[in-house]
């Protein structure tokens, strides 16, 4: 067999063993996807003994491509809610993440000064303890420029010693915070869903009887509130007749209007129109029905609802719009994106025609448009390769192959649609690509660090380095995690994502996601802090090297 064939076969073996190890649980807690790393260490130990040669270029490619796949799909998943989360809680989350980095940097200074650990080894331990490979590369480059010899070897070995237990330190911190605060995961997930409006309707229906005499004879659009497009009138009942009103429909006293909107807007309309009645709000007569319709027609992507003329042509009202789990009041200026769910109300004989304009092709929701995937990955790699020059630093800083694809994916997922290209990815496809990516990445890291792992552990300073690594990993996490829970009042699942993001650690995020698989709290907080943290993690070893070298 060729070296490449042997390498691929061993990667598959590592994945099988690692995923099996990941399913082991002690008191309900297991390594999860992190087991692949230890599977790689075990396999690497035996391949080193038997002298099997692995292709270095193949390993390097698989590691980087796996990482790119993982962070890109994470960005696509959380992109629609990332920017709104940044406005609501981003400052607090990033402040906690910066505190973790600051405490970790102080720990490195203590290890170097008090324990008298050489600078190159201290920075290698730091990079492994915070599970950040770009930090390792940045530290090696600046130490080489400062004239420190053999940094690649010494930093690489110390990094390998600290990395596996760096992951364990994060998982241990999550577990201890859960035990210490007696966290009930289901309650935390329900609280997150309630706060993010994922498990409750942000819009409501009410039926108002027109008792304001001043409204008699006015058209619907002339009534204050409708012109602001904060409320939608989905139907009008007059005596025994029920219709879907248009903007030009005249309103009469004693008409009953069914309105859709948020609580504040509906309260204003109650003051303007009249009192609320107990008319049915969900049952529709035989002539009028409602449907939930998914936007799948490529011809309407990126277009405003007003431009489609749905209401003018068919007399159909779009009363609600659900995008990425968030319900909105649609207006004429709302731009449609692939996967938007519209609540449409109209006469049975014309509603199907209006639905055909929107699409509602369920099979399209199961398909992955591959062209946008590779456009996004390509743009992400380019962005990650752009150097940022900061005065006083001899080495240019970069987002790298992890940060670049993540930032681009967040932006593209937020944009949603460009022409006929859409960055919607079915959840099952997203999960499959994400799992494949993280398994490939961890398998290679395990194979690379496992060759000298046991020898350094038994005969060298491995245990000492591990101890320093656990100190650098665990102490900042447990301190900030406790503060975030006690004083920041953060959701436990959000804290788990924060801890994983502050260490730029995909395996820890995978573990956090597995705590409550159907909840996006951890992934959202991870993505909220990741871009800034990645930049600071790359910059911090360079800053530490300059400061400690000068001292």
Curated annotation (Swiss-Prot):
One Pfam family from the record? Asp-Al_Ex
Q: How does it sit in the membrane?
A: Multi-pass membrane protein
| Keywords on record | Cell membrane, Membrane, Repeat, Transmembrane, Transmembrane helix, Transport
Q: Where in the cell is it found?
A: Cell membrane
Annotated RCK C-terminal domain ranges read 191-275, 277-360
Q: What superkingdom heads the lineage?
A: Bacteria
**Gene Ontology biological process terms in this record:** potassium ion transport
- Stored SUPFAM superfamilies: TrkA C-terminal domain-like (SSF116726)
Question: What cellular component GO annotations does this protein have?
Answer: plasma membrane
Give one GO term, molecular function aspect: monoatomic cation transmembrane transporter activity
TM segment ranges = 4-24, 28-48, 65-85, 95-115, 157-177, 370-390, 402-424, 438-458, 463-483, 492-512, 529-549
The UniProt entry, under NCBIfam families, shows: PRK03818.1, YidE_YbjL_dupl
- What family does this belong to? Belongs to the AAE transporter (TC 2.A.81) family. YidE subfamily.
User: Which protein, by its recorded name, is this?
Assistant: Putative transport protein HI_0035
- Biological source species: Haemophilus influenzae (strain ATCC 51907 / DSM 11121 / KW20 / Rd)
Lineage in the entry?
Answer: Bacteria, Pseudomonadati, Pseudomonadota, Gammaproteobacteria, Pasteurellales
């Amino acid at each position: 067999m060729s070296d490449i064939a042997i390498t691929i076969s061993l990667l598959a073996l590592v994945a099988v063993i690692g995923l099996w190890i990941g399913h082991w649980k002690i008191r309900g807690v297991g390594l999860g996807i992190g087991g692949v790393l230890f599977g790689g260490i075990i396999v690497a130990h035996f391949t080193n003994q038997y002298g099997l040669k692995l292709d270095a270029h193949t390993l390097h490619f698989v590691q980087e491509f796996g990482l790119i796949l993982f962070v890109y799909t994470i960005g696509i998943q959380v992109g629609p809610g990332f920017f709104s989360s940044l406005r609501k809680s981003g400052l607090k989350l990033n402040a906690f993440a910066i505190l973790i980095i600051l405490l970790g940097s102080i720990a490195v200074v203590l290890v170097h000064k008090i324990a008298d650990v050489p600078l190159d080894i201290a920075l290698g331990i730091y990079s492994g303890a915070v599970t950040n490979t770009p930090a390792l590369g940045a530290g090696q480059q600046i130490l080489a420029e400062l004239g420190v010899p053999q940094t690649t070897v010494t930093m690489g070995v110390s990094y390998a010693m600290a990395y596996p237990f760096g992951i364990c330190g994060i998982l241990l911190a999550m577990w201890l915070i859960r035990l210490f605060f007696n966290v009930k995961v289901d309650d935390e997930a329900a609280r997150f869903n309630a706060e993010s409006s994922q498990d409750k309707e942000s819009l409501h229906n009410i039926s108002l009887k027109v008792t304001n005499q001043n409204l008699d004879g006015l058209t619907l659009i002339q009534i204050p509130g409708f012109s602001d497009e904060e409320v939608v009138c989905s139907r009008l009942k007059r005596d025994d007749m029920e219709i879907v009103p248009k903007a030009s429909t005249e309103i009469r006293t004693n008409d009953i209007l069914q309105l859709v909107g948020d609580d504040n807007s509906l309260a204003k309309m109650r003051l303007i129109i009249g009192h609320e009645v107990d008319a049915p709000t969900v049952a529709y007569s035989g002539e009028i029905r409602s449907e939930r319709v998914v936007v799948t027609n490529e011809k309407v992507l990126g277009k405003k609802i007003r431009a489609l003329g749905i209401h003018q042509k068919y007399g159909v009202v779009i009363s609600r719009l659900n995008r990425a789990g968030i319900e909105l009041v649609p207006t004429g200026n709302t731009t449609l994106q692939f996967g938007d769910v519209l609540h449409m109300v109209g006469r049975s004989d014309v509603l199907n025609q209006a639905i055909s304009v929107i699409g509602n092709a369920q099979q399209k929701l199961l398909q992955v448009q591959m062209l946008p995937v590779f456009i996004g990955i390509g743009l992400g790699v380019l962005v990650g390769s752009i150097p940022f020059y900061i005065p006083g630093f001899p080495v240019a800083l970069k987002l790298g192959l992890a940060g670049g694809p993540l930032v681009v994916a967040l932006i593209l997922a937020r944009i949603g649609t460009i022409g006929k290209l859409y960055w919607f990815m079915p959840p099952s496809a997203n999960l499959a690509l994400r799992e494949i990516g993280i398994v490939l990445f961890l398998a290679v890291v395990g194979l690379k660090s496992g060759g000298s792992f046991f020898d350094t552990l038994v005969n060298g300073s491995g245990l000492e380095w591990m101890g320093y690594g656990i100190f650098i990993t665990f102490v900042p996490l447990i301190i900030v995690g406790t503060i975030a829970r006690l004083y920041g009042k953060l959701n436990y699942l959000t804290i788990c994502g924060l801890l994983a993001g502050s260490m730029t650690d995909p395996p820890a995020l995978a573990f956090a996601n597995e705590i409550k698989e159907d909840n996006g709290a951890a992934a959202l907080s991870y993505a909220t802090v990741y871009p800034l943290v990645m930049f600071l993690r790359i910059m911090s070893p360079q800053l530490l090297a300059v400061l400690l070298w000068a001292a």
